[in-house]
Amino acid sequence: MSFVSTPPLSRTPAEAEPAKPIKNDPFYPDVSLEHARDTIRFDGTITDARLRHELLAAIAEVNDELRSARAAWRDAGITCLADVPADQLDGESVRLQHYRRAVYCLAKATLIERYRDYDTTGDGARRADELEPQGDELRRDARWAISDIIGRPRMTVELI
């Protein structure tokens, strides 16, 4: 039996510098690719371009789900999510922490689902099957984070 190991992909010269944060709607925080990468534990196999693409899609989805809550907060004179009354942890509003969690979880879930086409060998198919529940759990975590932002109770329903 032989063992073959490949080193992690090194960043291209264009990616050698930290990627610029994603500019978000002024109500919501900008999203740092470096923070996202560190938080959701992706290695160098996910390029900045691919990560940016999935984070943009996740931001759009979360912002859309928060649209009515944002309108209500703006009607109340609140100009950004950080100003919505909330507990502070580590010097930051928990709503901001929940926002990032929702975005990061959705992005990671989508990237995990895309790994199915990355390696279609028998081992790759088994690995993809192992990751499927993780993707579902990440989507659940994102929904819970959104519920926490707007103060809606979390709910899990199973069909009997």
Task: Name these PLM-found stretches.
Residues E61-S68, D90, A109-D117:
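Amphipathic alpha-helical interaction surfaces
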Residues M1-V84, W144-I160:
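Conserved short "hinge" loops at termini or chain/domain junctions
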Residues R37-D43, V84-E92, R127-L131:
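Charged, low-complexity surface segments at secondary-structure and domain boundaries
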Residues R95-I160:
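Short loop/turn elements at secondary-structure junctions
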Residues D75-Y99:
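Short, exposed interaction segments that mediate macromolecular assembly or regulatory contacts
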